[in-house]
Amino acid sequence: MEYDCGFTKEDKWFRYRAAAIIIEEGYVLFAGNERENYFYSIGGAVHMGESAEEAVKREVFEETGVKYEVERLAFIHENFFEGDGSLEGMKCHEVALYFLMKPRGSRELNSNSYTQGVRETMHWIPLDKLSDYRAYPTFFRDKLKNMKNEIEHIITYEN
C-alpha cells in the first residue's frame, strides 16, 4: 500500500505534492471534475519513498494516460488556503514542486482518471486566456507567459 506524504492534525492539513506544467501548441493542461467549479493543475501527492520527479511522471500518466518526460523543475510553490469540498473548514498548507514537461507536439490524451470517486476531465486552456478562467494555481496566469530558465520560489495565500 502506498502512503501519501501529508498529514492532518485537528483543523490543519498538509500535503507534499508534485505537479506538471504541460504546454502544447499555446495551451496549458488543467484538470477539472463535476464536483469542483474550478480547474486545477495536473499532479498529486508524492508517496513515501518516491521522488517528486517519479511522482509527477506517475501522476501525469494516471491522469492523462500519456507518458510525458520531465524537462526541468520550474517552481517551488508554498500555498496556504482555506479548504473546501472534502477539506471544508481546514487550514491547508501545501508544498508543491512544479515540473515543466517536455512537449510532445500533440494535445491528444487518453484520460480515464478519478479523484475521490469523481471522474476527472482534462482541459486545454489557451495560455493567453488563462486569466479568464478560475484555475489554480493562480500564479500560472503571469508566470507561464514569461517563464524564466530558473527555479522560482512562490508563496501564495489563496482563499
Language model features: what each stretch is:
Residues 1-19, 25, 90:
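Acidic, metal-coordinating catalytic segment for phosphate/diphosphate chemistry
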Residues 12-14, 87-95, 114-119:
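A generic structural micro-feature
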Residues 15, 23, 41, 68, ...:
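Short connector loops at helix/strand junctions that flank enzyme active sites
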Residues 22, 30, 101-103, 124:
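Conserved hydrophobic "DFG−1" position in protein kinase catalytic cores
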Residues 24-66, 75:
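Conserved Nudix-box catalytic region and its N-terminal flanking loop in Nudix hydrolases
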Residues 81-110, 143:
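Active-site-adjacent beta-strand/loop module that shapes the phosphate/pyrophosphate-binding cleft
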Residues 100, 111-144:
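NUDIX/MutT-family hydrolases
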Residues 136-159:
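Charged phosphate-binding loop/patch that engages nucleotide di/tri-phosphates or the phosphate backbone
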